[in-house]
Amino acid sequence: MLSLDQIHLLLNTPEDCYIIFGIDNITLDIIGVNNDDNRRNEEDLTDLLHKLFISTNNQIKISIQTETIDNKEIDILIIHDTDKVPVFLTKDYKPKKDTALPKGLIYAINGSINTPKDSSAPFELINELFQKFNHTDLNIKEQYFHVLKDYKNWFFIENEDGRFFIYNPNPDFYIKLNDDDANRFKTMSYSLNQYQTNIDWQLVQLRYRHLTIDECMAMYLDQGNCLVPSPEVESFKIDYQETIYYHCLYKNTLKYQLLKVFSSIPGLEKYPLTRFKNSIVIYDTKLELKKTHNLINSKFSSKDIVNQLEVTEKDFDFYYKKARHKNPDYSIQENQVNLTELNLVRLLKTQIIHTSLN
């Protein structure tokens, strides 16, 4: 059986932890859980954990992976890594046939030694857990990613020194926006659906005190009504001869977190942001991209895909005139490429839903 002190030990660690059910603890023989009356599914265990008097019980994430060996099923309980540490009891726990666990004590694994049930982990180990909670155990670039995830605590300021996003809990973290004068495209596929199609490019500097930790490009869309990071470019192969490029963002990346920070500026219109998101693909992971590409290539022939990406004369004329109004250098070739990309984006977005269900 899984005990409460074991849960504490496994939560107060630096990585995912695993408990295997269906293997004898002493002989290591595979006995299986096929007929085990104590077997629990993921939903049952999650519900049980949320009822315990644990400081972060609602933050605990688990999953169960079942494997079959010699026709015997074993369950692998994965307790996923969390930064909501140290974990401790909020109320005394007194099991009928085991040692009582006092509230407030912190159990952890120190090397190969478990914290005794009537004691707390040593100071050095508790300090490491608090460093994990505050992300100070990470390098500065990884720390930056975590403060960006706290996007509601950033605020925008513009003064004679420039334009900045500042992190309220720790102003040593701040973002500086700089006008970019390089000769770049003035119109992109994801700006065509804006009321104003021209782009104002920005150099984004992620700074910590006087140091620049990272840089990337961003742009104001719709005459400054929306600020977004420059999306990534990916390729889709129709066949061995033809490849089409399109723009996307990946969740759980620095650029996606920047998008959330930029979107939190008070007073900005929400519609330009919606139009931008509709013009790119937002993936959970690279694996989702691969699944989506494979699904399209399995469902449609190359000819069918080409037909779905074909730009209508009506769309071509409309967007060409619209873009040329603000950008006289906008060419017929650019327009064809951009509109083909938008058609590909629409196709990809319809298939992402299917991959998430498989």
Walk through the language-model features, giving the residues of each:
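Bergerat-fold GHKL/Histidine-kinase-like ATPase
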Residues: 1-31, 35-46, 51-52, 58, ...
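Intrinsically disordered, low-complexity regulatory tails
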Residues: 56-147
